[in-house]
Amino acid sequence: HPFIEKDTSPANEYEGLTHQMNRRHRSLTRQIIQFDVEFPNPFIQEKLMIGAEQPVYNIHRLRILDNEPYILEHTFMPVHLVPGLKKAHLLSSIYDYLHQDLNLHFAGAYRAISADKSTHFDQEYLNCSEIDPVLDVQQVVYLKDGQPIEYSSSRNRFDVRNYSLLDVRSN
């Protein structure tokens, strides 16, 4: 099977990419493309269940695995739920900051996985061509109290990553 040659991640995994790759003894680094605080547009307001005047972090990062472009992430997080987020956290692990420093814990996530045509941004940062498809994983992550803490879109090259899901039927 050709997918065996790709990195496969469980679709229901919540530890984050840093922990996944540390377990596999892989070198994961990050490049910050954008890190701003802004007011959310109506789409982000709906996804994060916040008002128009509640600021969010707007984060664009390139995840680099073993010195190769791996995932292009665009993440929004409400500032009031993630106070004190700094570039140092973006360069290490945002999820470690949430779990260890802020004592926040996830209840689950809604994920939508689809194929898409590569954008100019994908081509620039993931080194793919304009005819290469990308795997787009959009997710909303929820805290245990039900509040959405993250909306993100992760763009993956078609030839380097996929996701698996074990679907067990219950009677």
Where are the predicted features?
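A short beta-strand signature
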Residues: 52-66, 134-142
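Short glycine-/small-residue motifs
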Residues: 71-72, 151
